[in-house]
From Swiss-Prot:
<dbReference type="Pfam" id="PF06689">
    <property type="entry name" value="zf-C4_ClpX"/>
</dbReference>
<feature type="domain" description="ClpX-type ZB">
    <location>
        <begin position="1"/>
        <end position="48"/>
    </location>
</feature>
<dbReference type="InterPro" id="IPR046425">
    <property type="entry name" value="ClpX_bact"/>
</dbReference>
<feature type="binding site">
    <location>
        <position position="6"/>
    </location>
    <ligand>
        <name>Zn(2+)</name>
    </ligand>
</feature>
<dbReference type="Pfam" id="PF10431">
    <property type="entry name" value="ClpB_D2-small"/>
</dbReference>
<dbReference type="GO" id="GO:0140662">
    <property type="term" value="F:ATP-dependent protein folding chaperone"/>
</dbReference>
<dbReference type="GO" id="GO:0051301">
    <property type="term" value="P:cell division"/>
</dbReference>
<dbReference type="InterPro" id="IPR010603">
    <property type="entry name" value="Znf_CppX_C4"/>
</dbReference>
<keyword id="KW-0067">ATP-binding</keyword>
<keyword id="KW-0862">Zinc</keyword>
<feature type="binding site">
    <location>
        <position position="32"/>
    </location>
    <ligand>
        <name>Zn(2+)</name>
    </ligand>
</feature>
<keyword id="KW-0479">Metal-binding</keyword>
<keyword id="KW-0143">Chaperone</keyword>
<dbReference type="GO" id="GO:0016887">
    <property type="term" value="F:ATP hydrolysis activity"/>
</dbReference>
<dbReference type="InterPro" id="IPR019489">
    <property type="entry name" value="Clp_ATPase_C"/>
</dbReference>
<protein>
    <recommendedName>
        <fullName>ATP-dependent Clp protease ATP-binding subunit ClpX</fullName>
    </recommendedName>
</protein>
<comment type="subunit">
    <text>Component of the ClpX-ClpP complex. Forms a hexameric ring that, in the presence of ATP, binds to fourteen ClpP subunits assembled into a disk-like structure with a central cavity, resembling the structure of eukaryotic proteasomes.</text>
</comment>
Amino acid sequence: MAGKFCSFCGRDIQQVERLIAGPNNVYICNECIDLFHDLLRSDRKVRIKNEIKEIPTPAEIKAELDKYIIGQERAKKVLSVAVYNHYKRVFSNLDSNDVEIEKSNVLLIGPTGTGKTYLARILAKILNVPFAIADATPLTEAGYVGEDVENVVLRLLEAANFDVERAQYGIIYIDEIDKIAKKSPNPSITRDVSGEGVQQALLKILEGTIANVPPQGGRKHPYQEFIKVDTRNILFIAGGAFDGLEEIIKRRIQSTTMGFGAEIKSKKEMRLGEILKHVTPDDLVQYGLIPEFVGRFPVIATLDDLSEDDLVRILKEPKNAVVRQYQKLFEIDGVKLEVTDEALRIIARKALKRGTGARALKNVFEEMMIDMMFELPNLKNVEKVVITEEVALGKEKPIVVMRESA
């Protein structure tokens, strides 16, 4: 290759490590390849940053959350600050060799149906980033029947249509994280494959590593080619109900205040959310999470259990409230839907009794409306449908108001 030179930088073969030949006597050297690779990566990062747009301030993030989520003021503030700091860290460190700011993964603790998953989903929508939900329950450590922890990242890749660069700036919500707590604080002869082993396996991914992700889901396809995903800039939000954690917290609070004349509220006097606000990392370790795992979640936010008043507001106030959704469905048929305040309270009361929080609201409403929704398309000249307290109690049918004939 004497006399050959790079068509891009002009250096000859003696000045570079390697010269690669192309068609029509065109050559490119290894240094130009590295340069162009860096340029392409830089362009992709700029594209991703532009897609995420300007990072909203914590106040702006919370204002958007307020449109969809009723109550949970403290949790919304904590999440807004954590997400803002996360993406500020991501984009300030893209080309920086200065101080490295640690990740601000978030742990959400709260009763079932209080909006943990929904909070994470709305955050991703606000920021225009890929979002995926993974269930911690089927995860097991390598070598055991179940799902590999890398499948958590696979969910995000799928949500990003396998655009690796875009996925690397996404949000992953790991649900039921409390289910991988150690079953016992004492080590046993039998391996706890769904507990401590899974926590250990998740550590690297949570902190930031190059994960080898199986595009076809892992163990059933052992010979597939892995996709490398850098998890350093992925925000992990984990959530769980942590049933029984309140007892650990109460015991600690009572032992530290004993003998000082402090008034201890009984369990009946304290709402669950009020107790959970006092959680510490040590409480989580006692619950069954290993210290290293707890350390990967520097931000902890607790959610309040929902009251009847909260559920009434959730029914009608958010941007996508259940009542608004049904009113829109009726509107498409040219019919107004009216739900009285008394009916809303009965619906909220029924949902509260089911013990699954806000997620029960739509079920209760659907059960009440199914017959009306079935009959409505066949009815002519209907102006309005009214849902009263008696209808919500199941004692009467919805009131159908007909249009006056011209």
